[in-house]
Amino acid sequence: NSVGKPSLSDLDGPTQVRGYSTAPRGTGYPSMVVTAQTWNQELAYEYGQSFGNDMKAVGVVGLWGFACDLHIDPFFGRNNESPSEDPFLAGTVMAKAVSGVNTRGRYTFLKHFAVYNAYCERTYMSEQTLRETNLKAFRKAFVDGGSLGAMTSYQSVGAENSNYSEALITGVLRKEWQFKGAVTTDAISGADYQFEGLVRCGGNFGMNVALGAAPTMKDKIKYSESETTGRMQNRMRDAVHQILYTWLHADYNERYYQANGKESGSYISSTSINSWVWWKPFLISLDVVAGCALVYWMICATLNFVKLEKEENA
């Protein structure tokens, strides 16, 4: 009430708004795999816009989706929610779909950040592999697509749960990718969840499934200012600021789109600066030199052919 923020509704549904809830529901779309198989970025963008229209129609502001997980395990039961096993294709499709939703003043909690592709015996990989696969797909969706929300996943990153992994949420997402939005958990199903760890490490709130429902969980989560440390109070202020930013920036995205028209479809993104690599200018220079040499050879060959023709006819 102090800042005038209205009560907002965030709901699930990877291919249908309110797909797991009672009616009214949005349109039931094909799976994201089908969208990726078209290799059509404009279609993915329009998919997001149509999804955003459905969200507005049924009164949903935030979507617990889209999924940007990679198809590492073919037996994983949720592969249909995410586009592909290829990080570039998955990231490109997600970036366009998220951008489309943004034009409708809605926001997405891109999930599951990160490495969620099995129910048990989760994936083991090095940091380099992580950055070249799963994080590569998410980076395109966050940086190029401008997703305003993120949903964590339930597995360990090293020896820490990914929900309160400071290296992943604060280090990669917020510092490296300059993400300013809100981070939520996946569905909470137990009373031993370390909500304070989530907030301390860059998260914002837990999905309201079991949060605070069990007495033991109520005892562990401290809402009283007198019982909370100064560091936690400061972090809570940052968390609230990020939640408000998500809501207000979604509204800004829609207003900007309406003011600038359809041609501004690529504006909704963070600032992405491609790192300089030596081989790009080298290859361009090599192409130019090879092209000039080919043109020179063709001119010389033509002149020589004309000269020989004249000598034969003389």
Map each language-model feature to its residues.
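Glycoside hydrolase catalytic-domain context in secreted enzymes
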Residues: 1-314
